[in-house]
Amino acid sequence: MNKALIVILSTVAIDAIGAGLIFPILPELLIEVTGGGDIGFLYGVMLAVYAVMQFVFSPVLGALSDRFGRRPVLLLSLAGTLLDYLVMAFSPLGWVLVVGRALAGITSANMAVASAYITDITPAEQRAKRFGTVGAVMSLGFIIGPIIGGVMGAWWLRSPFLVAALFNGLNFFIALFVLPESRKSSPGTFAFKELNPLAPLVWLWNFKPLLPLVTVYVVFGLVAAIPGTIWVLYGAERFGWDSVHMGLSLSVFGISGALAQAFLVGPLSRRFGDLGTLMIGVFFDTLAYGSMAFANQSWMGYAVAPLFALGGVAMPALQSLVTSRVSDDQQGQLQGVLASLMSLAGIVAPVLTTAVFFSTKSLWIGTIWLVGAALYLLASPLFATVSAPKTEANDG
């Protein structure tokens, strides 16, 4: 594995760890800075601000990386993330924490640039495997983050942010001296209209051959929000799980998913192609959602982990298919749009998921899982529009 890829993967890991470490300590942190008042509103604002900033700035950073190169945008994002962790570690005021989360949302948009960098340095036939590695690293980061937050937060509430700042600072300096540029900056005069976050979305809308795949991408984001949103609620009501079972089940799912993405995506893609791997993943994910709907014993909740893990091979294959249809000088813009759409799905889907879950559980508690499976089935006609990958440029 080359040095550049290691730096990019460490950036992805630190982003995932940073996103996860705040959740175990955020309620106590808000109680500390507010003096014990009602934290509900401030808690919601901090989560919403993060998601909105990520939605707005993902396409902006992606487009800027197409114009000026990936390296400077990544370095700027890493510096911003370091500043955010320091703000979160020492801020005595609630509104400053909100500003810190806004900054975190902006800098977390560097995932779009990291994905574009991987696309730049990876041959088309190996992209699914590389995106699978990225998914595995993210899964491990989301497991490690809450552990760091919970364990170190018990020692000192702010200490997880200092640890994250340390790792991020080290990554910044390693990237500064080791990370090469993956593409040259584009010629021409910079125009401020390039900072318009809606411009890449307009570009996507005008790029008709890409729309079916991007629609599938959004469906994936909506469906993936179901377990992420209701897993704890469902486990408690359906299986009677306590916090130990919750933590154990999340670890089992995270580790099995990471292993599948790290070790299965490459072989499956070589054997069946990206489209075949996508279909395999959708099949097993649909089977997993259907199985969860009918699971009524605790062990069944664990037994579906391999199905969800196999379902996880679909997203790297889909990312590879999407990148193969866009020219090299538009990969940053593409990844920015994809990240922005996933952020939007992350804002909307939890609201819809909880609404469906609570409105249907009195009829049948497993309904929400069948809704996820049904979304895959409704999207299946779009797969018929997907042909063999071809790189295509579009100036919009």
PLM features: residue spans?
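Multi-pass alpha-helical transporter architecture, strongest
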Residues: 3, 172-178, 370-396
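Short amphipathic helix-loop junctions that connect adjacent transmembrane helices
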Residues: 25-40, 229-246
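Conserved MFS/SLC helix-loop-helix module at the cytosolic interface between two early adjacent transmembrane helices
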Residues: 55-93
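Structural signature of the two symmetry-related core transmembrane helices
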Residues: 72-87, 165, 276-291
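Cytoplasmic helix-loop-helix junction between adjacent transmembrane helices
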Residues: 99-139
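A membrane-interface helix-boundary motif in multi-pass transporters
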Residues: 153-166, 355-376
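Juxtamembrane intracellular "pre-TM" segments in multi-pass secondary transporters
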Residues: 180-215, 238
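C-terminal transmembrane helical hairpin of 12-TM major facilitator-type secondary transporters
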Residues: 275-318
